C-alpha cells in the first residue's frame, strides 16, 4: 500500500517515486502507510483511526473530514495539507511538519504535537486543548493582523 523502502522519503527530493492514491470515503483503520510517499493524495472522509503514517511524505494531501483518531503521524511531512474538519483526537504528531496546513474545524484535542512544526498553519481555527494551544502559540504565534470570522 505504501513505499515502505529503506530510505527516508523526506530526505529524497525525487518526486517521481511518489505514489498518488485515492482513499476517499474508505475505511483504513489500523492501516500501515509507514514511510509512504503519497504527496498530493486524497484521504477525504477516510477512516484512518489508529493508522500508521509515520516517517512519510503526505504533503499537499486532502484529509478533509477524515477520522484519524489515535493515528500515528510522527516524523512525517504534511506541508500544505488540508485537515479542515478532520478528527485527529489523541493522534501522535510530534516531530512532524504541518507547515501551511488548513486546520479550520479540525479536532486536535489530546494530540501529542508540542514538538511539531506548525509554521503558517491556522492552528487557532482548530479545536485544541488549552495546554497545547499555549505551547503552539508560544512557538508559532497567531498573526496580529488576523481577523477572526467567527
Model-derived features: positions:
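Tandem repeat scaffolds
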Residues: 1-150
Amino acid at each position: 500500500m505504501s513505499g515502505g523502502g529503506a530510505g527516508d522519503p523526506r530526505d529524497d527530493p525525487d518526486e517521481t517515486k511518489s505514489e498518488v492514491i485515492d482513499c476517499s470515503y474508505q475505511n483504513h483503520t489500523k492501516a500501515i502507510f509507514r514511510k509512504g510517499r503519497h504527496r498530493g493524495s486524497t484521504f477525504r472522509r477516510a477512516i484512518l483511526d489508529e493508522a500508521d503514517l509515520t516517517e512519510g511524505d503526505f504533503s499537499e494531501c486532502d484529509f478533509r473530514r477524515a477520522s484519524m483518531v489515535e493515528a500515528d503521524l510522527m516524523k512525517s511531512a504534511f506541508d500544505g495539507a488540508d485537515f479542515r474538519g478532520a478528527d485527529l483526537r489523541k493522534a501522535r504528531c510530534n516531530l512532524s511538519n504541518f507547515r501551511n496546513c488548513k486546520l479550520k474545524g479540525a479536532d486536535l484535542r489530546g494530540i501529542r504535537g508540542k514538538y511539531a512544526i506548525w509554521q503558517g498553519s491556522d492552528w487557532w481555527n482548530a479545536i485544541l486543548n488549552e495546554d497545547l494551544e499555549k505551547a503552539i502559540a508560544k512557538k508559532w504565534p497567531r498573526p496580529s493582523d488576523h481577523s477572526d470570522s467567527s
